[in-house]
Amino acid sequence: MSKVAMVTGGAQGIGRGISEKLAADGFDIAVADLPQQEEQAAETIKLIEAADQKAVFVGLDVTDKANFDSAIDEAAEKLGGFDVLVNNAGIAQIKPLLEVTEEDLKQIYSVNVFSVFFGIQAASRKFDELGVKGKIINAASIAAIQGFPILSAYSTTKFAVRGLTQAAAQELAPKGHTVNAYAPGIVGTGMWEQIDAELSKINGKPIGENFKEYSSSIALGRPSVPEDVAGLVSFLASENSNYVTGQVMLVDGGMLYN
């Protein structure tokens, strides 16, 4: 019987790459995303089914705790179990520090931090209910290791995810659950297109130039693609990582060394 994973933000980008890789590893996948993303999620589901695994779409607003609880219940019921949660959903904000508003902070913390907290709580309770030793895998970032200018709000949320990952790992270890995080660098996805465009508005550089400059420091000589990140998540979701918990692992091609 296949194990079951739920991937938040699974309709596109890194979430799609993770879903496809976990399906190749033999997982059935609940693709969780905002209801209006169901059409995009259908493309992810096609990739999962092409790997001969089951897939369902679960409508989820990750900032709503009750919705998160019910989404995990739905995933477990439809797919017949629940073994792994990938807290992948997240947003970026690109603003000078002095222009960040209270509303900006509320929005980015709701999506990037509160949702991770809600997911950890809901997944752990479901693991306990089903009697499984589960795995929770959170989305961090190179910005969880080093703060970046113009990304101050985003950086603080990712530092929060790092601390939460470490704390949750210690609390849930007696139950046999592991909690880890992946920390991508420069990934060629829609989020980085947004970051590049917003930075261009601020510093006047041509579109693509900021992405190029950030990528120039990567030791392996190229920005990453979702498949690079998915490979690490694959390890963290597998039995090969059973003795790994509380870790925030860089997958940045050699940008930061920590």
Swiss-Prot record:
Its EC number is 1.1.1.76, 1.1.1.304. Slightly activated by Ba(2+), Ca(2+), Mn(2+), Mg(2+), and Co(2+), while Hg(2+) and Cu(2+) cause marked inhibition of the activity. Ni(2+), Zn(2+) and Cd(2+) have no effect on the catalytic activity. Is also slightly inhibited by lactate, pyruvate, succinate, acetate and formate. It catalyses: (S,S)-butane-2,3-diol + NAD(+) = (S)-acetoin + NADH + H(+); (S)-acetoin + NAD(+) = diacetyl + NADH + H(+). The active site is at Y154. GO terms for biological process: acetoin catabolic process; acetoin metabolic process; butanediol metabolic process; fatty acid biosynthetic process; protein homotetramerization. It comes from the Bacteria. NAD(+) binds at residues 12-14, 33, 37, 61-62, 88, 154, 158, 184-189. Keywords: NAD, Oxidoreductase. Stable up to 37 degrees Celsius but is rapidly inactivated over 40 degrees Celsius. The keyword ATP-binding does not apply. InterPro entries: 23BDH (IPR014007), NAD(P)-bd_dom_sf (IPR036291), Sc_DH/Rdtase_CS (IPR020904), SDR_fam (IPR002347). Homotetramer. Catalyzes the reversible reduction of (S)-acetoin to (S,S)-butane-2,3-diol (L-BD) in the presence of NADH. To a lesser extent, can also catalyze the irreversible reduction of diacetyl to (S)-acetoin. Cannot oxidize meso-BD, D-BD, 2-butanol, 1,2-propanediol, ethanol, acetol, 1,2-butanediol, 1,3-butanediol, n-butanol, and n-propanol. Cannot reduce (R)-acetoin, acetol, dihydroxyacetone and 2,4-pentanedione. Belongs to the short-chain dehydrogenases/reductases (SDR) family. This is L-2,3-butanediol dehydrogenase. The lineage of its organism: Bacteria, Bacillati, Actinomycetota, Actinomycetes, Mycobacteriales.
